[in-house]
Amino acid sequence: MAIQQVDRYIPEGSTAFYRASISDEKGVRISSSDINSITLTLYDVASGSVINSRDGQDVNGANNGTYVSSNAGITGATNADPIVITSNAHGLSSKDIVNVSGVLGIPNANGTFGITKVDANSFSLDRSASNGTYTSGGTWTYSLFTMELGADDNTIVGSGVGADQPELHRALFTVTYDTTRTITHEVDLYVQQLTKV
């Protein structure tokens, strides 16, 4: 069984969907009238599996997960709008996209954000609003795979390198037909995902 095309798009507020064209290994299409049941078990590929790379992203980076490349600790965050993160010698540029986690005292500082570089040691989190006072902790990780959409939710206003990168997942399709015969195949699902930040 081969999946010829699979797409998954996740607009804000909607659920994922898949589109696929399926045929068996010999190219004989199994029609719906012949099928008693179809089951699909989807699971992620282990880190390090080989996948195709697009948009300039190297295969090693693609295989390491959604957030790759630079990362560093956070030593401060302002109680201001937008939130300004202190991270010495961060090396980021305006319009880069980061995932922030582990910041204590300001819950809104955690998440995925486009950033604006303030100086060599600080950057602001675009569209953020503080809801507390920084106490400690936090790390940020540079994201290569996220697109930032404008207020109209349609215009891409910024993205990391490789924002079109497809993710690879594996799935088991089990097709039972003619009551007694069952075909089970492991297939690769190349998934393209757009996430609003």
Q: Model-predicted segments: where are they?
A:
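Contiguous segments within soluble domain cores/interaction surfaces
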Residues: 1-68, 142-197
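Small/polar beta-strand repeat architecture
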Residues: 68-144
